[in-house]
Amino acid sequence: MMLSKVVMGLLTASLAAAHMEMSWPYPLRSRFDPQVPEEDIDYSMTSPLNSDGSNFPCKGYQTNTPWRATAQYTAGQTYNMTITGSATHGGGSCQLSLSYDNGKTFKVIQSMEGGCPLVSKYNFKIPGDVANGQALFAWTWYNLIGNRELYMNCADVVISGGTGTPSSFESAYPDLFVANVGNGCSTVEGRETVFANPGDQVIYGGTVTPSSPAFPICH
């Protein structure tokens, strides 16, 4: 017999609190999204991506989940995203990025270097020169303490008011930093991840300052 959403939520409460997850904008298959059918909810959204990279990006959900925008953004405006959970693993570093090709390419619009996610809400600005239309909005996190992992949640969003195209946006913004998914790049426990190309919008926390050297350096 199928468990109700409430009962399943109670049974998985400890798992949901084990790590962190983006709760707004609603990620693909999120338990926070009231429009996701019960049978499609991922109650392990807080789990990291597979260490072999087999479900990078977005746990693969962008390829098998019907597209439905959970947020609408206007270029040049400021919005917020929310992270939920209790085990912050000492913080770490996060990035916010956009993809216009269904997850093949992610470009960074904001980095939070150090101390992320020690607060639950972050403001971010949608740049004025982004492209319009459907996009994937992604939150990625490299924890400071614990196993070397990559956490990633993605949301379908729609953007208007931008002056760019997908190609011009991809040319103007840095690539998403990717590590700990079998790609030959790994972070180091206890050492802050400092992105080599964080973009123009950067929030500093923990022990990271604007003069902190990039680490790790991966090619």
UniProtKB/Swiss-Prot annotation:
<feature type="binding site">
    <location>
        <position position="19"/>
    </location>
    <ligand>
        <name>Cu(+)</name>
    </ligand>
</feature>
<comment type="function">
    <text>Lytic polysaccharide monooxygenase (LPMO) that depolymerizes chitin via the oxidation of scissile beta-(1-4)-glycosidic bonds, yielding C1 or C4 oxidation products. Catalysis by LPMOs requires the reduction of the active-site copper from Cu(II) to Cu(I) by a reducing agent and H(2)O(2) or O(2) as a cosubstrate. Has considerable affinity for alpha-chitin and, more so, beta-chitin. Active toward both alpha-chitin and beta-chitin allomorphs and enhances chitin degradation by an endoacting chitinase, in particular for alpha-chitin, and so plays a role in fungal chitin turnover.</text>
</comment>
<dbReference type="GO" id="GO:0004497">
    <property type="term" value="F:monooxygenase activity"/>
</dbReference>
<dbReference type="GO" id="GO:0046872">
    <property type="term" value="F:metal ion binding"/>
</dbReference>
<feature type="disulfide bond">
    <location>
        <begin position="94"/>
        <end position="116"/>
    </location>
</feature>
<keyword id="KW-0325">Glycoprotein</keyword>
<keyword id="KW-0146">Chitin degradation</keyword>
<protein>
    <recommendedName>
        <fullName>AA11 family lytic polysaccharide monooxygenase A</fullName>
        <ecNumber>1.14.99.-</ecNumber>
    </recommendedName>
</protein>
<keyword id="KW-0479">Metal-binding</keyword>
<keyword id="KW-0119">Carbohydrate metabolism</keyword>
<feature type="disulfide bond">
    <location>
        <begin position="185"/>
        <end position="218"/>
    </location>
</feature>
<dbReference type="GO" id="GO:0006032">
    <property type="term" value="P:chitin catabolic process"/>
</dbReference>
<keyword id="KW-0503">Monooxygenase</keyword>
<keyword id="KW-0624">Polysaccharide degradation</keyword>
<keyword id="KW-0732">Signal</keyword>
<dbReference type="InterPro" id="IPR004302">
    <property type="entry name" value="Cellulose/chitin-bd_N"/>
</dbReference>
<comment type="similarity">
    <text>Belongs to the polysaccharide monooxygenase AA11 family.</text>
</comment>
<keyword id="KW-0186">Copper</keyword>
<feature type="binding site">
    <location>
        <position position="89"/>
    </location>
    <ligand>
        <name>Cu(+)</name>
    </ligand>
</feature>
<keyword id="KW-1015">Disulfide bond</keyword>
<keyword id="KW-0560">Oxidoreductase</keyword>
<feature type="disulfide bond">
    <location>
        <begin position="58"/>
        <end position="154"/>
    </location>
</feature>
<feature type="glycosylation site" description="N-linked (GlcNAc...) asparagine">
    <location>
        <position position="80"/>
    </location>
</feature>
<dbReference type="Pfam" id="PF03067">
    <property type="entry name" value="LPMO_10"/>
</dbReference>
<dbReference type="GO" id="GO:0000272">
    <property type="term" value="P:polysaccharide catabolic process"/>
</dbReference>
<feature type="signal peptide">
    <location>
        <begin position="1"/>
        <end position="18"/>
    </location>
</feature>
